[in-house]
Amino acid sequence: MSVKLKFDYPADGGMVQRSRSFTGVNTLGGRRRLSSARSSLRSKAVTGKSPRIPSNSRAGSSVWGQQPEQVDRIFQALRKGLKDYLESHQTELDFLSSQQRDTKRNSRLAFFYDLEKEIRALERYIRRLEFQISKVEELYESYCIQWRLCQGALNMKRAFSLSPSSRQSRESLLELNRNHRHSLEDMSAMEAELEILLGELHVKMKGLIGFARLCPGDQYEVLIRLGRQRWRIRGRIQTDDRQMWDEEEMVFLPHIHGNFEIKVTEVKGLSSILVGMVTCRSADFFTARPQMMVVDITELGTIKLQLEVVWNPFDSTEVRPLTASASRQSIHSRKGSVYSWTPPNTPSFTEKYFLSMMRQMQDADGSFSIGSRESRGVSLLSYLADSTQALSPPAYEKTSGPPVAQHTVLDAKIQDDDLLKTHTDAEESVEWPSETDTASPSPAGSKRDSIFLFHRYSTPDILKQSGEMSVSAGEGDAQETTNPDEATEQETSFKQETEDRVAVKDRKPSRAQKKAVAKRVSALLEDLNTALEETSNVETLKKLDLQIRQLNHVLKKDLDASQVPSSQTLAVEEEEVLGSFDFLSADCTEDEMPIMSSIRLGNTGIGSFNESTLKSMGLLCQEQRCVSSEDSAEGQVRLRGDAAVKASVTTGVYSLDQALETHLSVCAVLLRALKQSDSDLVHKDIMDELSRQVNVLEKIAALSQKLIDEISAADLLSKTPKGIEVFWKECCESDSAFCCSTEAFLRALRKHFIHKVKAKEPGQTDAVFNQLLHQVQCSGMVASVTLCTAERLTVFQLLVYLSRWSITDFGEHISLLSKEVYLIACLESPKRRRALKKLKGKRISDLQPTGRILQLLAKLQTDANHKVASAASSCLNRASRSKSFRAKAVVHYTDLLKNSNTNVRHEACLALKSLKASESAEQVAELWRSADEDLRNAARETVLSFGKKGQMAFQRMDQIYELQDEAYKNLETEITIL
C-alpha cells in the first residue's frame, strides 16, 4: 500500500545521519574498538558517522553472559548475506561483460570507456566482498575453536567439583578458571571484531498504515532503538492523507546482542499515549536486496509501520547500490551524443592493412564483389611487401596532393592482443564513415581525397603457390622483396595467434554441410509422409500430416535460391566455381558425346551436372535439349527421377534446417514408439508430445516464410522466463541461431546457474547439468524414446521443456533438479534405506521425477536386503498418493513392460503393483505366459492385486491363451495326419 509522505529533511537532500546514542557519539576512527564514552549529544544533531560504542559495562556483561548461539546465528546470516551480495554483483559483472563483448571496440567511443570503467570498479568491489567473506569465515572458525575450549573447560570444572578436593585438584581448578576466563575474553574480542564487519543498516521511513485509525491532525512519534542507538521522529497526518515526518532515513550500526525496538506513541498536547511496542531481530536484515518491513504496532494490526531496511556490508562512503548504475543505463543513450564521435587520428597498422585489403576486393564501380579474381591474393605479407604504396596520413587528412610514401615496419606491437582483437572485429563487421564525415574541407576534393584511396596489393611471387598469378598487367609497381623463410615464419605466427580468436566467430557452415542437412530433411519428410499414411485418423496425427504437407509446400526446393550473395564469402564462391567442373567426373566417352551433341551422365557420387551448369558454360542450347540417342534419353530420365526423389529442401537458414531435422527425427521416433505400444496411457503421453512437436513445426514453417535477414530466435524467447534469452544467446553466440552444441549448453549452464546447484558431493554439478541436458533432449516420460541428435540442442527443445514442466524460474528448477540428482546418489549408496524412509510427503510431490529415480525405486524392490526392498515398496505406495508423480510413474513403468530385459520387466511389474496401477492391468497380464517363472508369478500377483478389474483382465488373457493352445494342437494334429 502506497503512502503519501513528505519529509522536512529528506534523505536525498544531504548526508544521511547516524543514529544517536544514549551515551554519546564517537568519530569514525573511534569505531575501531574504542570503549571510551563521550558526552551526550542529545541536544544537537549528529553530522558525522555514529560509531559503535562497546562500553565497559557492555564488555563486562559480554564476558560473563556469553550467548554463543546468537553469535553463531549472526555469523551464518552475515555470511549468507555477503554471498548473496557477491552473487548479485557477479551477475551484474557478467551482464556488463556481455555488453562489452557485444560493443564494437573503437577508441573514439566514449561510452566504451564508461563501460570499461564500470567493469573495473565492479571487479574491485567483488574482490573486496570476497576478502570480507574470507575474513568472516576465518573469524568464525576461530570463534568456534574458543567456544569448544570454553565448553571443555566447563566440563572439566564440573568433573573436578564432583571429585574429592585435593591440592592438585585445586591448582588444576584455578588453571581451568584462568583458561576459561581467557577464552571468554578472546570470544569477546572476536565479537568486537565481528561487529566491525557487520556493516550498516539504512532504515528509511515509509509511513504509518492505519485505515480508519489515522485521522487528519493526529501526531505520532516513532522511536527506533538498536542497542544504545536511537532514532526519534515525529509525524503528522495532513488533511489530504499526506504524512509529514521530520526525517526520512537513518543509519544504524548492527549489534550482535541487540535487537530493533520500535515504539510508537500518539502525541496529544502535553501528554502521549503508547500505541504499541515491537522488537525485531537485526540478523534478519543481512540480505543483498532492500527489505520492506511492515510491523504490526497494535495486537490486532490496526496500525502498521512501514520501514525499508537496506544493508550495506561496508561504510556509507563505499556503498555501491545493487540497482543498475546510471552509467550502465546511459550506455546506449550516449551513442547518439555529441562526444560519441571524435575526429579520427592517425591510422594504425591494422587499419591500413584492413582497408588496403578491402580496396583489393573493390570493383571499378566502387562495389564489393565476391567474384573478383584479383581479390584472392590478399594477405598480410602482400601489404608488408608493398609498403611503399601504403596509405599515408595525408590520405586521411584529405589533402589535395598525392599521398606521401610511408614505410611500415612490422614490430612487436603487431602481435599485441588488442591489435589482433581489433583486426578480427574489423573483419567481422565493417562500419565505413559516412561521406560527410570524410569530406574534404577544401573545394578541390576529388576521388583521390576519399577514404577509399588505396592501391592494389598482391602476394609476393616467392610466396605464391604454383600456377597462382594474381598480379594484373597494369600493376607494374615495384615491390620490396622479402626473405621467404622470414615471411613464411611471420605469416605462420600471425595465423597461429589469430586462429583461436577467428575460429570462434568464423563458424559458417560449408556448402556441403548445408546440402547434407537439406537432403536429410527431405528424406525425413518423405519417411513421415509414408508413416502417416499407415496410421489411424487421430486428430493429432491429422495435424502432423497437415503440417508435413505444409512444410513440403513452404520449404525452398532450390538450395541456391536461399543464399544471399551479399553475405557469401570468397571460399563459398570458389566451391561454386569448382563445382561447375563436375562434368569431368562424369562417365563420358568420345563415342557417347560426339561434338558435345549429347551427354550421358553417370552416377559417380561426386557431383551433379545439371542443365543450369551446362548453360553457364555454353555447352547446352535449346535445340540440344532433345537428344537423339536412346541411351542419352534414358540417362536424362533417370537423372530427373533421382532429382525428384532426392530433392533438397531448406528453410534458408542452416541452423533452422538443423532444428527442423532434429524435430522431424523426434516425430519419426515418436511414431515408431506409438506403433510398438498398445497401452492407452503410453499413447496419451506420446500424443501430448507429438502435439508439442506439431507446434514446433508450425513455428518453423512460419519462420521459413520470412526473409532470411528477418529470421531470428529472439522472437521465440521473448516470452520465456527471465534470463533464458540471455542464456540462449550465450549458448549459440548469436541472436539468430536456432541450435547450439551440447558443450556450449553445458558451459553456459555452468556459468549462469552453478550457484543454483547445492552440491554436496564432488562431481554433482556436472551430473546435474548432464541430467538437465538429457531431459531437454528427451521427449516425454516414455523410456523407449531415444535421443535423436545427441551432439546438439535446439531452441525449440528448450521451449518445449519449459512448457512441459511449466517452468517459471529456470534457476529454481535447477535447484530442485540438483536435489533429485543427490537423491539418486543416495539411492545408489549404502544409505539407500534411510533415503527411502525420508522420501515422503512434499519431497515426493517436488520430484519431477526423472527416469533414473523411477528405475532405482523399481530396482530396489528386488534388493537383496529385504528391509531395503520393503522400504522401496512402501515408498512407491506412499508416492501413489501424489497424482503428478503417479501419472508419470505409471506411464514410465508401463512402457518398460515391453523392455527386452527380463529383470527390468519384473521390476516394472512390481512397481505397478505398489502404485496400484489398475489401468495397466492388460499390459501386465500379457506377462503371465512369460518363459521366466519369477516374472510370471510377479505378473499374476500384480494383476490379482488390482481387484475386479485385474481378475477380468486375467481371465481374458487366460481365454486368449487357451484358444491359442487349442489352435496350435489342431494344427499339429493336421500335420500328423497328412
From Swiss-Prot:
Spans annotated as Disordered: 33-63, 424-447, 465-511
Feature: compositional bias, Polar residues: 53-63, 479-491
Pfam families: PL48
SUPFAM superfamilies given in the database record: ARM repeat
Biased composition (Basic and acidic residues): 492-509
InterPro entries: ARM-like, ARM-type_fold, FAM65_N, RIPOR3
Annotated PANTHER family: PROTEIN KINASE PKN/PRK1, EFFECTOR, RIPOR FAMILY MEMBER 3
Family of this protein: Belongs to the RIPOR family.
Protein name: RIPOR family member 3
